[in-house]
């Protein structure tokens, strides 16, 4: 990827400024379950340490996380102070049945529920953008599941004048 000019952010982040807006963009694989799961060997302590450092800024934080499971099922949006997480891995459920939805997703099993879309934290301040992506599993091809590339416009919050 680097030879094509991409900056791979694996347990790394960059602080950038675009049009006067200060952003922090980082990347992880995604085994970043909240602290309460660390004793269960389900979490990657290295990712948790990275996220503690990553979230320690006043900048708008954008995280690329290959795996969405910590964000969907384990209170990740509530636990971590990260404004927007972009994720995939679930392939939108690989096989979609009308009226039922996704049949199977990697690491989530049968009839997993939320497989793509935008999901918000309870207070509405943090967001997960989950893409069905372009990929297939090696065993089952996509069925009734159109590959997608997600495009998101990030715009600064407009502060209203106090009158």
Region locations from a protein language model:
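Residues that act as N-cap/strand-start positions at coil-to-secondary-structure junctions
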Residues: 8-10, 57-59, 113, 146
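Binuclear metal-dependent hydrolase catalytic cores centered on His/Asp/Glu-rich metal-binding motifs
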Residues: 1-6, 18-64, 71, 139-142
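Solvent-exposed coil/turn segments that connect beta secondary-structure elements
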Residues: 6, 13, 28-31, 133, ...
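Acidic surface patches and DE-rich sequence motifs
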Residues: 17-18, 121
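Generic detection of short hydrophobic beta-strand segments and adjacent strand-loop junctions
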Residues: 14-16, 152
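Conserved beta-sheet core of the metallophosphoesterase superfamily
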Residues: 68-153, 159
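Short loop/edge segments at beta-strand edges and connector loops
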Residues: 10-12, 65
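A short, highly charged, low-complexity intrinsically disordered segment
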Residues: 49-50, 158-163
């Amino acid at each position: 990827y680097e030879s094509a000019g991409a900056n791979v952010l694996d347990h790394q982040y960059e602080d950038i400024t675009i049009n006067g807006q200060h952003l922090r963009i980082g990347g992880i694989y995604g085994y970043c379950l909240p602290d309460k799961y660390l004793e269960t060997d389900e979490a990657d302590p290295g990712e948790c340490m990275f996220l503690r450092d990553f979230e320690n800024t006043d900048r708008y934080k954008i995280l690329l996380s290959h795996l969405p499971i910590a964000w969907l099922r384990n209170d990740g949006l509530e636990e971590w102070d990260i404004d927007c997480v972009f994720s995939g891995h679930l392939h939108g459920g690989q096989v979609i049945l009308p009226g039922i939805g996704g049949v199977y997703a990697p690491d989530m099993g049968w009839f997993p529920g939320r497989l793509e879309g935008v999901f918000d934290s309870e207070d509405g301040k943090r967001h997960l953008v989950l893409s069905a992506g372009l990929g297939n599993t090696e065993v089952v091809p996509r069925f009734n599941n159109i590959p997608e590339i997600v495009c998101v416009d990030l715009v600064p919050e407009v502060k209203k004048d106090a009158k």
